[in-house]
């Protein structure tokens, strides 16, 4: 029991020691930055594409163009 409490305390303190800034409901800032980095050759909204990986962020390739979708309509059609 004592060991599990110490382990949980360690897991709670670890991000503070590592210097990661955590907000209430967000992932670490490093993850947000990596998620928003545009890869070379990715298309923006309305630009031409050949597949879902060609589109930036949450955009999907539909009928040769990058479009916005929602979680209700994912890119896997």
From Swiss-Prot:
Nucleotide-binding is among the record's keywords: no
Presence of the UniProt keyword Repeat in the record: no
Signal peptide: 1-19
Predominant place of localization: secreted
Family: Belongs to the conotoxin I1 superfamily.
Tissue: Expressed by the venom duct.
Organism: Californiconus californicus
Domain commentary: The cysteine framework is VI/VII (C-C-CC-C-C). The presence of a 'disulfide through disulfide knot' structurally defines this protein as a knottin.
Protein name: Conotoxin Cl6.15
Prodomain positions: 20-37
Gene Ontology CC terms: extracellular region
Disulphides: 49-61, 55-66, 60-75
GO molecular function, one term: toxin activity
Swiss-Prot/TrEMBL keywords: Cleavage on pair of basic residues, Disulfide bond, Knottin, Neurotoxin, Secreted, Signal, Toxin
Cellular localization per UniProt: Secreted
């Amino acid at each position: 029991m004592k060991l599990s409490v110490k382990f949980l305390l360690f897991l709670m303190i670890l991000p503070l020691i590592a210097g990661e800034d955590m907000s209430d409901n967000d992932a670490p800032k490093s993850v947000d930055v990596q998620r928003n980095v545009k890869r070379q050759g990715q298309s923006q909204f309305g630009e031409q594409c050949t597949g879902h990986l060609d589109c930036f962020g949450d955009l999907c390739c539909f009928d040769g163009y990058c479009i916005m979708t929602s979680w209700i309509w994912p890119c896997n059609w």
